């Protein structure tokens, strides 16, 4: 029996990060967590490319372009969508998630969904480096593992 598993060795991996400027007080913390997670696992600063976009809705297009460029072993998407009084939250969350998934499936490159979708600002803060850890860091570790899984399948 063959078992293919990813590992958490980031040495030599090239990682793209797409991060939303909207709710930057949260997304900047997610970005710091992601970069910390990548570098602690051996990814060189020179092998990390960060691209800022206006909001979560714009993330999928840039993630897809980066993935299709074949310059990256994985793409991490980071954003923070916080529920408001209208249904706008539902549309943005749904389309961001669908778009990120589509980018991965059409490009064959892992595109990791690190977009927070929370009901409150407090929940977002908790997931950006306090009580609930840093979801940017978790997305970075997932990106490394998935890049290595795909290398194992090649």
Curated annotation (Swiss-Prot):
Annotated positions binding 5-amino-6-(D-ribitylamino)uracil: 22, 56-58, 80-82, 113
Gene Ontology cellular-component terms listed: cytosol; riboflavin synthase complex
Reaction(s) the record says it catalyses: (2S)-2-hydroxy-3-oxobutyl phosphate + 5-amino-6-(D-ribitylamino)uracil = 6,7-dimethyl-8-(1-D-ribityl)lumazine + phosphate + 2 H2O + H(+)
Signal peptide extent: none
Active site: 88
Database matches in InterPro entries: LS, LS/RS, LS/RS_sf
Entry's Gene Ontology BP terms: riboflavin biosynthetic process
GO molecular function: 6,7-dimethyl-8-ribityllumazine synthase activity
Residues that, per the record, bind (2S)-2-hydroxy-3-oxobutyl phosphate: 85-86, 127
Function according to Swiss-Prot or TrEMBL: Catalyzes the formation of 6,7-dimethyl-8-ribityllumazine by condensation of 5-amino-6-(D-ribitylamino)uracil with 3,4-dihydroxy-2-butanone 4-phosphate. This is the penultimate step in the biosynthesis of riboflavin.
Subunit description: Forms an icosahedral capsid composed of 60 subunits, arranged as a dodecamer of pentamers.
Protein name: 6,7-dimethyl-8-ribityllumazine synthase
Gene source species: Geobacillus thermodenitrificans (strain NG80-2)
Gene assigned in the entry: ribH
């Amino acid at each position: 029996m063959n078992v293919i598993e990813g590992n958490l060795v980031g040495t030599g991996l090239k990682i793209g990060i797409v991060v939303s400027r909207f709710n930057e007080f949260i997304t900047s913390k997610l970005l710091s967590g992601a970069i910390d997670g990548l570098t602690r696992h051996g990814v060189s600063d020179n092998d990390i490319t960060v691209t800022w976009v206006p909001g979560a809705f714009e993330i999928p297009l840039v993630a897809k372009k980066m993935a299709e460029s074949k310059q990256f072993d994985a793409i991490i998407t980071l954003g923070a969508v916080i529920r408001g009084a209208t249904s706008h939250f539902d549309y943005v969350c749904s389309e961001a998630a669908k778009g990120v998934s589509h980018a991965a499936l059409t490009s064959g490159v892992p595109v990791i969904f690190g977009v927070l979708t929370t009901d409150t600002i407090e929940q977002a803060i908790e997931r950006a480096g306090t009580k609930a850890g840093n979801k940017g860091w978790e997305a970075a570790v997932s990106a490394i593992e998935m890049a290595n899984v795909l290398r194992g399948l090649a």
